[in-house]
Amino acid sequence: MATDADMAIFGEAAPYLRKSEKERIEAQNKPFDAKSSVFVVHAKESYVKSTIQSKESGKVTVKTEGGETLTVKEDQIFSMNPPKYDKIEDMAMMTHLHEPAVLYNLKERYAAWMIYTYSGLFCVTVNPYKWLPVYNPEVVLAYRGKKRQEAPPHIFSISDNAYQFMLTDRENQSILITGESGAGKTVNTKRVIQYFATIAASGDKKKEEQPAGKMQGTLEDQIISANPLLEAFGNAKTVRNDNSSRFGKFIRIHFGATGKLASADIETYLLEKSRVTFQLKAERSYHIFYQIMSNKKPELIEMLLITTNPYDYQYVSQGEITVPSINDQEELMATDSAIDILGFTPDEKTAIYKLTGAVMHYGNLKFKQKQREEQAEPGGTEVADKAAYLMGLNSADLLKALCYPRVKVGNEYVTKGQTVQQVYNSVGALAKSVFEKMFLWMVVRINQQLDTKQPRQYFIGVLDIAGFEIFDFNSLEQLCINFTNEKLQQFFNHHMFVLEQEEYKKEGIEWEFIDFGMDLAACIELIEKPMGIFSILEEECMFPKATDTSFKNKLYDQHLGKSNNFQKPKPGKGKAEAHFSLVHYAGTVDYNITGWLEKNKDPLNETVVGLYQKSSLKTLALLFASVGGAEAESGAGGKKGGKKKGSSFQTVSALFRENLNKLMSNLRSTHPHFVRCLIPNETKTPGAMEHELVLHQLRCNGVLEGIRICRKGFPIRILYADFKQRYKVLNASAIPEGQFIDSKKASEKLLGSIDVDHTQYKFGHTKVFFKAGLLGLLEEMRDEKLAQLITRTQARCRGFLMRVEFKKMMERRESIFCIQYNVRAFMNVKHWPWMKLFFKIKPLLKSAESEKEMANMKEEFEKTKEELAKSEAKRKELEEKMVSLLQEKNDLQLQVQAEADGLADAEERCDQLIKTKIQLEAKIKELTERAEDEEEMNAELTAKKRKLEDECSELKKDIDDLELTLAKVEKEKHATENKVKNLTEEMAALDETIAKLTKEKKALQEAHQQTLDDLQAEEDKVNTLTKAKTKLEQQVDDLEGSLEQEKKLRMDLERAKRKLEGDLKMTQESTMDLENDKQQLDEKLKKKDFEISQIQSKIEDEQALGMQLQKKIKELQARIEELEEEIEAERTSRAKAEKHRADLSRELEEISERLEEAGGATAAQIDMNKKREAEFQKMRRDLEEATLQHEATAAALRKKHADSTADVGEQIDNLQRVKQKLEKEKSELKMEIDDLASNMESVSKAKANLEKMCRSLEDQLSEIKTKEEEQQRTINDISAQKARLQTESGEYSRQVEEKDALISQLSRGKQAFTQQIEELKRHLEEEIKAKKCPAHALQSARHDCDLLREQYEEEQEAKGELQRALSKANSEVAQWRTKYETDAIQRTEELEEAKKKLAQRLQDAEEHVEAVNSKCASLEKTKQRLQNEVEDLMIDVERSNAACAALDKKQKNFDKILSEWKQKYEETQAELEASQKESRSLSTELFKMKNAYEESLDHLETLKRENKNLQQEISDLTEQIAEGGKAIHELEKVKKQIEQEKSELQTALEEAEASLEHEEGKILRVQLELNQVKSDIDRKIAEKDEEIDQLKRNHLRVVDSMQSTLDAEIRSRNEALRLKKKMEGDLNEIEIQLSHANRQAAEAQKNLRNTQGVLKDTQIHLDDALRSQEDLKEQVAMVERRANLLQAEIEELRAALEQTERSRKVAEQELLDASERVQLLHTQNTSLINTKKKLESDISQIQSEMEDTIQEARNAEEKAKKAITDAAMMAEELKKEQDTSAHLERMKKNLDQTVKDLQHRLDEAEQLALKGGKKQIQKLEARVRELEGEVDAEQKRSAEAVKGVRKYERRVKELTYQSEEDRKNVLRLQDLVDKLQMKVKSYKRQAEEAEELSNVNLSKFRKIQHELEEAEERADIAESQVNKLRAKSREIGKKAESEE
């Protein structure tokens, strides 16, 4: 650990990088209890520091730092590390490795602003959200050359380590920077680039001058300036980050051999182009749009025809438009200057701005809908004119292309109409594409500019890419990012543990290698392997009718339940809908696949793309040059056009995978360094850290994954000496004292003597390795031991100190005793006189001497003091001199050492240079000698060639003369001269072939074509020979005529002959000389040709291997196509079988319905039914037999498939062997290339070292210059030869590189094909049942092909032999010619006979050649014909396989849909029955409640009437009293009293009325409460409706929800019954009325029973219908089995059809018949498709019927719920009415009591005051009694009448209600019966149609079978004839060979 002095070089950054010494000491001395200090899981804070209070029964009670007491499980506590590990720089060194330890270490370091921390291989950085002085220039210099452990954690340390590793290990490096948006990835990437630009540029201070006009700024400036430009076009504001990079980038910085910066390049990934057209509210688009509109450069506003207000442009104003932390004006100037520095031309710069402005204008394009049409039309042309002007287009063409694009249909283009939405979508896609392509083009241009063409040796790559993303809504972009991180994490796991395990291996630890990279293999394979997610996505993109649902279904079929990493998402409230889940290493992510197909295809308007390609803006045309537009494709021709078309449909996922694979291959070739960036909080607050957020990122970016892997190994390792020194205290006796012992053995003995798990540690060569956690245990044991030792030591120290103190006390005691004794003695003699005298005299004796001594001592003291001062001054001077001398000495030593090192290096370099120079001189001499030899040979050859040509021309002239003379003599002589002329032509042809060979040396790729040309030349020679033959025949005829003339001239010629003899001798001698010269030249040429042939043989071998591989690839491609066509054919056959099955199912259903209709009618019908059943049983047996046969054939097919797979495996093995051979040759060539490169490199290094030596050592330079001047002449002489040789070696190396590229391309193709083969194997296993006949056909075709190949090879051999015979004949002709020339005059007669023989043999040979050629041509034709037949057969096989696959797929889908609908139907039936039962029970309860309610209303009305009568009586009585008062004047007082009482009664009545009003208010309040309760119930009902709808979508919870609703309804019914009982208890007084109601209820119950009986009958009918439906299902299953049987028959038919097609190819007449049959089958197929459509319509009809039933069930449920609410309301109202009636009853009683009291008072008053008026009173009383009687009688009568009326009304209502219910039930049943009858009729009709179709198919089958048998017979006859012909041809060939 560095001291504070060492940290001083970091300047003001030191406190932000490492703790001070004081803090470290304080941390180590902090009190700490290892057993009680723990981290605890917390709900809010994730983990908190706590102290253990107690433990009991698996529970632990802890107290947190905040004072909170918690009780947790034991697995929820984590041990805390000792204080010395606080703020540790490398978290991998911690004793306890777990999540809370990592979290709190990061938190504490972040709180101290130490933002960089190591975690094993990782460097973790936390965003500080403020500026820290840790990137200053002095920090860069401080980190330079420091090892990782020597300096604090920092991004500069990672960068410098990568740089140093690159220089020392000679290996490429990479730095992987990942993290979420806003974590600081881009900033750290900038710092890395800044660091490299600083340290690599500082190594070479003298900058090289760049050519004028090429670039502005140095390479360092350009690398740094690339960032502002990429950020302007690729960065944007997001919610988390104001400057978020919306793309990933991999920056490669290249360095030379000396570490100097050489060049750079950038690769980008996953640009978020959707941001161009859409942004969220809190975000904004890319910075460049807002920079342009900042008006910092007004000329841009004018040029782009835009305004400065972003809200004028829809694409860039959907979110925010300004960012507080970014100054758009300054950024614009930075972007503009970056464009200039990076060397963009002014035109390119203008084009960038114009295209950016055009994208903004695109967002403002308006379109509208035409009247009465869906077609879109432009809403104006102003914006389009601006956009078209900026893009160099015609606005009218642009609008036309957008509204009416051209689409390719077949081979023609048609114009397609677009809706408004489609046009807007197209415009958005084009805008995104333009921006994306412009961004990628800028990256390419930047790379071109950063490529300085300087020599570069190594590179350091910096990867800045988004981290793992888990959002609420995850789409395709998240899958790509997460897949990238999955691959990077796998790469990290593999790399990390490879390093770990290399350490174990180096230390000699026994360890079984574990590749932790394979932990993530399952998820990676699920995504990228064949039939993975990307594969299925790309496959779906190829199908035009594919949808998101079909994509989801394929994913589920392929992976759900088969792969643990693929799961079905769990629905959560508030979350976005998800379609599937993937288990990544960072967690489970739910993905939504909406729109993935469109995103992946990324379609563009091809017509507009065609306009872009023709744009006058060159940059735009360049951007879309490689995209195949509508016009471009139609106009493209040749191979190039086809290639573009093929590559135009490249999906986004395929491109992404290609880039990712390239990135991973780059990373695997480097040594990686990992940096993980973290966001501390969401609010961008400096210093604050959110625990859950940081933990989530640690999981996502693999830090915790790295800890997991680290824990599986031995993460903690300590040197033996350190371990012995620190832990010796644990058992000191284990290490013997007094003798030497090795630290390793001491550590082994020490650990062996301690009670720990011995499997938790291992001993290496130099270190002891511990598992995680064991060191913490050792630390605890050490602390305990130290505590024991310290307590013992303290005890001994205290005892020793006390003993010392006691000894001192004893000594003090003795001295005190002595002093006391002396004092006592002195006190005794003090007063003695002699003692007094002694005291006076003693001091006087030595006083004078002492004064002298004191004076002398003072003088000496002063002298010594002065001397001491002088000596101190001298000493200081000497010390200063010594320090300065030491410093000078050290400096001089350093200089001497440096000069010595430099001298040693220089000497070594000089020696190396001399050696290399000698080697080079030797090589140059060899090369010059070889070159001179070759030049001399060439010169001699050319001279001799010219000589030969001249002599040949002279000879030709002489021969022509001779021929003219000999033509007159004899015809044979003339023929031989013609042949001589032909031979001379052949010599010229041979010269031409030599010239061709020299050309082939320059262009080796044309070798194959040259061989073809030679072949053609041979054929031409044969043709010329045939022509010569015809000419000779004509000449023979002519010469026979002139024979007589020749005889006459013979005598003349004899004389001429003697004369010419001398000339001939001379010519013969000259020709002999020429031939000798020619032989010498030929030998030299052969030597030269031998060297050329060696090179050519190598190249030809490589070409042959390449051709073989290409053939294999073609064969594999053909095989793939065959298999795909087989799958397609299988699918079609399956579709046909499916249609047959559907037809037969309808037939069976009709039959079953007929049987049911006719069931039980008559005995005859019963017999018919029995017969039908017997037939059915027979058919079932036949079906079972057919299935057995089918299984047998399937087994045979499996066996054949296994054989075919074995053949394919052998082919693959052969290909692998070829590949290994090629790779071996490739490695040899690479080694040669490496040797050449190393030689060139050593030369360049030597040159550079020489230049340096020349600058540093001038003396040596003068001597070397003299030597160089002497050698310069020789170098100048050989420089031209060297340049020529270098060009030749460059050509050879280029050819080798091309071959390497070809080999790598072939190997990639091979890998792709092996993957395709694996996919096809899986397809083959599924589609194996339909391969019997195609496999036979394929085998027979292969057999024929092999036979033909053998014949062809035999014919080729025969042809070669004929050619050899021909050449032999030619050579013999040449020999005869020479003999003729030498002995022509002497032996003319012998020459003539020989010439005749030669002519005859030549003629025979020519005839034989013609015969062989004709035979070859015929064999070639038969081979071509058979190849065509094989190709046709393969196409048919592929079709059948494809049809089978399609059928199988449709079968599965149909079965799945059928089972789902069956399940839904059963569930709805159950729900319907339950709802019907509930509705019946509720309707009965409703009837009861209604009756009770009406009775209570009647009772209330009677009470009201009685109340009114009583009030009337009271008023009558008061009137009578008033009349009595008027009649009797004496009783005025009584009257007053009565009036007073009357007023009191009125007040009482008013009070009663007030109480009545109060009660009415109560009633109103109760009604209001009732309404509120009703609304609550309605709300609850609505909520339950929503729940029911949701639960119906999820079928698993339907039963529970129905049960809950049932329970609720039972509770409400119980509540109603309870209310009813209470009501009956309250209404005991009106039992008479209740009896009437009971009787009516009994009658209603009777009616209810009747209706229930009717409902039971209907239920029975319904059950019968269900049973019949189940019977129909069984019959459908039977029909399916019959369909399978028919499918097997169809397969047999297909086999027969294919057999007939083979025979058709033998006999062309049969071909026509078979094609007619195919047409017939096609018509059948179309009819079956129509039946399939009918079936689909029937299914849709059934679905609609099921939906109706579901709707009825829902209506029934709603009615039931309404009935419940009505019943509850009625019960409440009934209760209220009962309360009011009881209250009125009480009021009535009170009023009766008051009337009685009044009556009593009135009697008393009359007795007191009216003694005389008794008679009148009695009369009045009698009158009153009569009136009362009449009133009572009238009341009784009216009450009875009212009761009767009410009774009859209730009865009428009940009857009407019952009749309405009956009528509804009858109608419902009638509808059900009608529907069932309709179904029965449709099933009958379908069965009849199926029966007819089956009959037709059977007749066709019989007919085709008959024709098949005939065709097979004809095929056998034809095959036997072919075999005979082959045998004949072989016999003829053998005869010809024997004759020769």
Curated annotation (Swiss-Prot):
**Where in this chain does the record put each Myosin motor domain?**
86-783
* InterPro entries recorded: Kinesin_motor_dom_sf, Myosin_head_motor_dom-like, Myosin_N, Myosin_S1_N, Myosin_tail, P-loop_NTPase, XRCC4-like_C
Q: Where is the composition biased (Basic and acidic residues)?
A: 1928-1940
Domain Myosin N-terminal SH3-like, which positions?
A: 33-82
Positions where N6,N6,N6-trimethyllysine occurs in the chain: 130
Region entry Disordered, spans: 1912-1940
**Single GO molecular function:** calmodulin binding
Keyword field: Actin-binding, ATP-binding, Calmodulin-binding, Coiled coil, Cytoplasm, Methylation, Motor protein, Muscle protein, Myosin, Nucleotide-binding, Thick filament
Region spans: Actin-binding = 660-682, 762-776
Looking up Gene3D superfamilies in the UniProt record yields: 1.10.10.820, 1.20.5.340, 1.20.5.370, 1.20.5.4820, 1.20.58.530, 6.10.250.2420, Kinesin motor domain, Myosin S1 fragment, N-terminal
**Cell compartment(s), UniProt:** Cytoplasm, Myofibril
Under the heading Pfam families, the entry gives: Myosin_head (PF00063), Myosin_N (PF02736), Myosin_tail_1 (PF01576)
Q: Which residues form the IQ domain?
A: 786-815
For the keyword Methyltransferase, the answer is: no
Cellular component, GO annotation: cytoplasm; myofibril; myosin filament; myosin II complex
Keyword ATP-binding attached: yes
Which residues take part in binding ATP?
179-186
Assembly and binders: Muscle myosin is a hexameric protein that consists of 2 heavy chain subunits (MHC), 2 alkali light chain subunits (MLC) and 2 regulatory light chain subunits (MLC-2).
Domain remarks in the Swiss-Prot or TrEMBL record: The rodlike tail sequence is highly repetitive, showing cycles of a 28-residue repeat pattern composed of 4 heptapeptides, characteristic for alpha-helical coiled coils. Limited proteolysis of myosin heavy chain produces 1 light meromyosin (LMM) and 1 heavy meromyosin (HMM). HMM can be further cleaved into 2 globular subfragments (S1) and 1 rod-shaped subfragment (S2).
Role, per record: Muscle contraction.
Can you tell me which family this protein belongs to? Belongs to the TRAFAC class myosin-kinesin ATPase superfamily. Myosin family.
What is the protein name stated in its UniProt record? Myosin-1B
The organism of origin for this protein: Gallus gallus (Chicken)
